[in-house]
């Protein structure tokens, strides 16, 4: 009997450890962007800060890029090509590089990947809280935030549905009529507007011009609120929810981008189509369909490197203590987190993962968040085949096929060659894969 009790306790401990291993979890809200929890379904990205008082959900849509379709082939390149070769063979690489830049480069270095902005949820009276917890469960691609204000427990559940193409935010409390908040949009774009009407909040904007290339991408994001109990009112660009029992917020975004030659779509109609369909389903249906579709890909690979009690510690502590070598399960977590990020940023029919994956808070991201095809794009996709995620490769292969078309003119114009060429970088509006300085 005594041995049975010991065995049972060890079994429970093992189960507890295993349950925590594929979660990133924290005992405090994110204080900066890199600490927020990333959600994504390839088309939409969201960074969840998890602040009880002022929740910020930074949003991305994969086709929000500055500038417009363009070419920057430079016909002067061919005229100096022979001299550049001679200089290189003579060991004068710096002189060759200078000559090449003067005659092959143009003012355009590619267009930048840009943020949509943020959806903000302001919860009056939630400045002081206890029992805080937030996590990202990478087995089901769902983020959770929970905390107490007084003796009321609040839970937020968030996911970007792979099945229904929307961000779902579900708010609960263990006391009736306890949910009250204001919802608003913010965006860094100068040309933008926010309209609140009934239960719908709409952000419309135009991406920015870049390097003398005018802006062409228009975007729209909508948040629609559905409550159980309470009421929803609109006021001065905000939606105000009071005395609700349960709230579900449906969020999506779209642009006018069709392909690298065509930006004629209606972004507003696209969002309406998505959210009209989402609104026909219950929260449970949305959650179940999302998890089911995600696990079809994620669940193909298991990795077990061993377990330890370190798995019960929050993620920042595990990372700090990892050098002690007593947390093999953290390696498993990081391996599976890499697969999670690729699933979340690259799906068939969408765009490839860029330098930011799909998550970016800037108008000018580091290196513009482009597809740096001399190594970084390849590195993004190293896990695709060897970790059994072959469908994530489809956007990359489509990019290569389109570069093969646009690169024909580059090869002819700059090198007087047949075939096609691409240099070390490209972007969504990649009608010209010409040389760039970054």
Set out the residue ranges of the language-model regions.
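Low-complexity, intrinsically disordered/propeptide-like segments
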Residues: 11-14, 312, 431
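Aromatic-residue-lined binding/catalytic grooves and analogous aromatic/hydrophobic interfacial grooves
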Residues: 20-429
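Conserved small/polar residues in nucleotide/adenosyl-binding loops
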Residues: 430-437
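Bacterial Sec-dependent N-terminal signal peptides
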Residues: 1-20
